[in-house]
Design a protein with these regions (language model features):
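Double-stranded RNA-binding/processing signature
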Residues: 1-145
Length: 145
């Protein structure tokens, strides 16, 4: 069972239509779930000092890397996933990420909205497949530099 479903059942959360959420709300939850995934991967890779773990995680969750992720997996997205990404990317954000261009920030917001939507629609396997694919493409690009 998906983590979202377990949380929903345990905490007796009401059923809501995910499409009623604003794209920035999807991005908010997507940011959190993506961070959990990245932290899980990094902690599993090596038992290191927490500050080194944090630095490694921060590099993968920053707006620029999230923008690279979505570009890496763009051709793998379904029409619906692409539409969710675009809703997030085009949302009018009040704030701007520190150390990020507006372009990267908006693109990353789209990526986070997609992650949030996949999580909230119990599509965690799909979410993980896209994250794995994106990370492997980014790593290959880094290695070829």
């Amino acid at each position: 069972s998906d983590l979202f479903q377990i949380i929903k059942d345990t905490m007796e959360l009401k059923d809501i239509d995910i499409m009623n959420y604003s794209p920035l709300t999807l991005a908010y939850i997507g940011d959190g779930i993506y961070e959990i995934v990245i932290r899980t991967i990094i902690v599993d890779q090596a038992n290191r000092q927490v500050n080194k773990i944090h630095k490694a995680a921060s590099n993968l969750v920053k707006a620029h890397t999230q923008a690279e992720m979505i570009f890496a997996i763009m051709d793998k997205l379904t029409e619906q996933e692409l539409a969710i990404y675009k809703r997030g990317r085009n949302a009018k954000a009040v704030t701007r990420a520190k150390n990020a261009s507006m372009s990267d920030y908006r693109t990353a917001t789209g990526f986070e909205a997609l992650m949030g939507w996949l999580y909230l629609t119990n599509k965690s396997e799909r979410m993980m497949l896209l994250i794995k694919e994106g990370l492997s493409i980014i790593e290959m690009e880094e290695d070829s530099k």
